[in-house]
Amino acid sequence: MLNSFSNAGIFLIQSIFDLYIFILLLRVVLQWVNTDSHNPLFILVARLTNPPLRPICRMIPSLHGIDFAAILLLLGLEMLKIAFLVWLQVNTTPHFIGLIVLAFSELLNQLINIFFYAVIALTILSWVSPLAHGPLVEILVRVSEPLIKPIRGILPSISGLDFSPLILLSLIHISEPTRPY
């Protein structure tokens, strides 16, 4: 039985892991969509993720714009987080295959969330300040546009209203994996 002190510790550990995994996954997404390397937000993400990635990048190079070192680190951190939390909560270690499946599921869910919230933020921003531009807007456009563009090709604007973000958000919501726990 876990007491409230243990629950607070578990929450803190999970939050720290989740925050760093999110930043690292954001780095992978920003590299994938070819974000400008001079963007201040990209520079911040790169500075936060470079220290553990440098030694791994020497062994595992990027290929076709995909940072395999970051993906390997993501998978390792997610597996470590899950194993550590399972060990703290039920005092056992999970099966390795189950750990890999859960880690992939969690990473896929977080990746989908990045796209989902980027589209929502860009949509709200287009209502509030349609002519806004800046480092954050550039990133939101770069992350959202590869997903919205094919839908715009199928469903053009109707009377000046663009329904493609709504369609995309519905598709993202439908495709979101269910958690096994």
Provide a role label for each language-model segment.
Residues 5-12, 41-60, 100-107, 111, ...:
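Hydrophobic alpha-helical segments of integral membrane proteins
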Residues 173-181:
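Single conserved hydrophobic/aromatic residue that forms the stacking wall/gate
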Residues 26-49:
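Membrane-interface helix-loop junction between the first two transmembrane segments
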Residues 25, 56, 76, 80-88, ...:
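Alpha-helical membrane-inserting segments
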Residues 22-26, 35, 81, 117-121, ...:
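Alpha-helical transmembrane segments of polytopic integral membrane proteins
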Residues 86-105:
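Membrane-interfacial helix-loop-helix connectors in multipass membrane proteins
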Residues 108-133, 138, 144-145, 165-168:
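Alpha-helical transmembrane segments of helical membrane proteins, especially in multi-pass transport
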Residues 5-28, 63-71, 109-116, 163-167:
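Hydrophobic alpha-helical transmembrane segments
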